[in-house]
Amino acid sequence: MRSILAISVVASATPALAHRGQHLISGFAAGFGHPFTGPDHVLAMVSVGLFAAFLGRRATWTLPAGFIAMMLVGGALGMTGIGIPAVEAGIAASIIILGILIAWGRSWHPAAAMALASSFALFHGYAHGMEIPEGSGVLAYSVGFALASLALHLFGLATGTGLTKQSQALHISGVVVTLAGLWVAFG
C-alpha cells in the first residue's frame, strides 16, 4: 500500500522547470499517467490480467511480462515514428477479443495466449510512444507507462484470481469487457 501511495505522489507531482532532473520526473509522471487517460488502455490492461488469471499457472506471470515487453517495443516504434497501420482499430480489437476470450472460458496454451496478447501490446505501446511529451526522458517515460500497465495487469490478475472460484462471474466480466470494447470502438 505504501508503494502505491509513493508512486501516486511521484506521478502527480509537478516539478518546477528550473530544477535539475525535471525531465526524468515529468517523463516518468507522464508515462505513468498515460495508461490511465483512456478507457481503452485501462480495459485492455485489466483484461490481460483477467485472462492470465483465467489461464492460471505460468500464464499468471508470462502473459503480463510478455505484454509489457512487446508494449515497450511498440513504444519504441511510436517514439521513432515508424508507422504501424490501424493502431486505434488494433487497440479496440484487443479489448473486444480479450473480453470474448474471457467470456468464452476456453483454455489456451500459454504460448498462444502470450503471442496473441503480445501482438495487441504493440498497438498499445505504439500509442504510448506516439504521445510522449516533448522534453520527456524516453527511459523515464517508458518505465512510467510500463509500471502503470503492470499495476493494471496486477489489478486484473487479482480480480480474476478472486473470481475464478465463481467462474460465472469471471465469464460475466468478459462480457462486460467485450461490451465496453464495442463502445470504445463504435461509441
Which residues make up each language-model segment?
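Membrane metalloprotein/metal-transporter helix-bundle signature
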Residues: R2-G187
